[in-house]
Curated annotation (Swiss-Prot):
This is A-type ATP synthase subunit D. The keyword Cell membrane applies. It comes from Thermococcus kodakarensis (strain ATCC BAA-918 / JCM 12380 / KOD1). GO terms for cellular component: plasma membrane; proton-transporting V-type ATPase complex. InterPro entries: V_ATPase_D. One of its GO terms (biological process) is proton motive force-driven plasma membrane ATP synthesis. Component of the A-type ATP synthase that produces ATP from ADP in the presence of a proton gradient across the membrane. The lineage of its organism: Archaea, Methanobacteriati, Methanobacteriota, Thermococci, Thermococcales.
Length: 214
């Protein structure tokens, strides 16, 4: 049997508990609906994260292969010089948006893709393979930023799902059962009190009648 609430067995408390149970059940349904919607949203974004992760792995393999070819083409020393002369790329701004009421990151950034001139290294000392390697790594950066946003969103959704699940379970297995058990107890106690009063009145009536008869 569920633990009882510490309340007085009165009709006022009985009515109050019944109202609280109605509200708790409505709250439970709303939270359960929210939990189900969060889980659906989580798996939708999870599928996107898997796709992005797979695409990122492929792009990284392509980028490192392109880098190896570029290094063979211009030499290791020249490759280091080129990498040190590259200008800083785009700035990344992290904002917030809401997904099912959960604040999640929104990363705003222009594409990292640039022309050879924008990168800052001298075109004459470079090569087409160096440009291709740079382009491939810029594609990697674009995907990495998107994946970071998606994976952080998943973490926050997972946390909210866990919090919502605990609330649903608390209502379903602890709070509502306690209130229902207390309602049952109060009803039983009120019935007992009513029967006791009934028998007490009968005894009083019998005593009065006995005295009247004598």
């Amino acid at each position: 049997m569920a633990e009882l609430l510490n309340v007085k067995p009165t009709r006022m408390e009985l009515l109050n508990l019944k109202r609280r149970i109605t509200l708790a059940k409505k709250g439970h349904k709303l939270l359960k609906d929210k939990q189900d919607a969060l889980v659906m949203e989580f798996f939708t974004i999870y599928d996107e994260a898997l796709r992005l992760r797979e695409e990122l792995n492929e792009k990284m393999m392509e980028a490192f292969k392109a880098l190896q070819r570029a290094e063979i083409d211009v030499g290791t020393l020249r490759m280091k010089e080129i990498s040190l002369s590259v200008k800083p790329n785009r700035e990344v701004e992290v904002k917030t948006r809401n997904v099912m009421g959960v604040p999640v990151p929104l990363i705003e950034a222009e594409s990292f893709k640039r022309s050879a001139g924008e990168r800052g290294y001298a075109f004459v000392s470079s090569s087409a393979r160096v440009d291709l390697a740079a382009e491939k790594f810029e594609e990697v950066l674009d995907l990495a930023v998107r994946l970071a946003e998606v994976e952080e969103t998943l973490k926050r959704l997972a946390k909210e799902i866990e919090v919502t699940k605990r609330r649903v379970n608390a209502l379903e297995y602890i709070i509502i059962p306690r209130m229902e058990a207390t309602v049952k107890f109060i009803k039983q106690r009120l019935d007992e009190m009513e029967r006791e009063n009934f028998f007490r009145l009968k005894r009083v009536k019998a005593l009065i009648e006995a005295r009247s008869g004598s």
